[in-house]
């Protein structure tokens, strides 16, 4: 008989304790029940239903087109899969920039309808009022600084951020503001490793890096990228932990051959 352990679920409080203990935090994106189940069983700490689903799942060039309802739909499956991991849902572009009231309304909608544990927002001081209102309303918030893909048109690309002193100082300032506002964690994307280390030491909440060196409190990657499913995409910060694109293509090729040859299904596979 299996016994469900009530305290086995990851929580924001446990993440903070992990930082205090010097224990690294592992986070990956996930967009569906099947893969999320495997990743959760492997012991991941955080499952992020990223708006990168706009690229990975929907084939869009940018993250901008995906909607709140689409994010909720994807997150529901991941939540059903997660027996251990904390599930965080990205708030998509346009869902928190219009007004503080609109931001809180959308954040609550995401939590209520998807069942996720928290939301993630991109930006610093400019979205601080919205973040404060969300946290006051009881919504756990993860921040995101550095390269913020929803601002790709403003930045003009996906290059390294905070290289210059002024931008680095602003990023550190923003991180402190997010921490003071009550964000339970902050993602730092594609910034110099030395700056990421400085931010990690300066804030009390866990800092998760992607392309931000190894001195952050944890790391995050897009699942499909680290599994080698997205052919031709290999930025400097990405490590392939598997090469599944060739595995999938070989399996499909073999399936096609067996169908064409009428060797599948065979007698043992037929009723």
Task: Set out the residue ranges of the language-model regions.
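Alpha/beta enzyme core
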Residues: 2-271
